[in-house]
Amino acid sequence: MKKIACIVAGLFVALTMAAQTKVTWSMELGLGMSTWMGKDAGDSSPLFNQKVGVGIDVPLSGLVSFQTGLYWASKGASIDVDYVGANTKNVVDMHVNQNYFEMPLLAAFHVGTAANFDMVFTAGPYLAYGVSGKRNIDIDDLTVSYNTFGESKIDGEIVSGLRRFDAGVMAGVALDFKRWTVGLDGEFGCCKLASNSKTRNLAFFFTAGYKF
């Protein structure tokens, strides 16, 4: 709860800043791929995922602005895991879906062009909190599904969930038109997804936004 409070407090500060200067609000949609990285990521494969939310651009000078907002971001990966059943042991494919509320805290650098748009380069940290998700394992004709975050009970055993809190670094580039933006964002997680694993999130999204 303390981590959620910190995220909400950060957004409140951004909104307070927005009330004191001329800002740009936008609705944004991103489509892309996510996977895991790190020593224990193994042969993880990417999944198609998306994010959607509200963005805020707060001008600091003619060339620099502060960008934040609140997004629903889906991440995850497909990975091979060992499954031990009653009479067998198999390597099976597990799809992990992780849904976060995510808040970026970015410095944006605006570069004018001869055309009718600006180039915008962004970089900075992000904070995220996992709110939902499922882990699905296909075993022959059977699908075993349990929660991504929080504990689950399978065959009488308690299975730990992934850590809810995530933070990392974002970087991106976008074309900024009068009413629209299009761009590419990369998100590189710095927090371990579980206490006994060194895997971290990795995601790339093509984004489009409408400014109002």
Cite the ranges covered by each PLM segment.
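Predominantly the C-terminal beta-signal and adjacent terminal strand-loop region
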Residues: 74-81, 157-160, 164-212
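Solvent-exposed loop/turn segments connecting transmembrane beta-strands
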Residues: 28, 40-45, 115, 193-201
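Residues on the lipid-exposed face of transmembrane beta-strands in outer-membrane beta-barrel proteins
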Residues: 27-33, 52-60, 70-72, 103-109, ...
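Bacterial Sec-dependent N-terminal signal peptides
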Residues: 1-28, 208-212
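Outer-membrane beta-barrel channels and translocator barrels
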Residues: 20, 61-63, 73, 112-116, ...
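Short glycine/proline- and aromatic-enriched beta-strand/turn motifs that initiate or cap beta-hairpins
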Residues: 20-53
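Residues that define the transmembrane beta-barrel architecture of outer-membrane proteins
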Residues: 21-23, 46-50, 97-103, 117, ...
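Extracellular/periplasm-exposed beta-strand and loop segments of Gram-negative cell-envelope proteins
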Residues: 35-46, 75-100, 130-166, 170
